[in-house]
Amino acid sequence: MHLARFPALFLGRLAGFLSRTLGVGGGTTLPGVVAQFLDPGLVSTLCARLERGVILLTGTNGKTTTARMLALMLREAGWSPIHNRAGANLMEGVATTFLYASDLRGQPRGDSGLFEMDEAHFPRAVALCRPRLVLLHNLFRDQLDRYGEVDTVAGRWGQALRTL
């Protein structure tokens, strides 16, 4: 076990507990922020430990519904996916999902990862998780102040996918 892993996992979980207990957020983002600050390689390491690999999905609409249906199908097929079902679809949310779905030694309690990702954060997720399967949904003009035009987002997706 990497020395930074235990403090990152423990203190990340503690941050989530305090966030929920004190009513400061829902505990879906802050734990991941803390864990990644303490161990920047946490997500990539835990993704690599998933026997069946990672499935990433992104798009403007339908991510949560599709991810939940796919999670049910995977479970019916005998898989044990780690899934960010709370809808926290930035890397911090993926890190938080791993915090609660891994033991304090950093061993995931699942055989696969199923992560819905925000359109702008998808390229980073590809780099960190090295997915075996990618599902791309529709792409519409959404949050232009943050993402720019559809062509910009699509170009970033293409660059990320070419690295696989």
Label each PLM-derived region with a short phrase:
Residues 3-164:
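Phosphate-binding loop of NTP-binding sites
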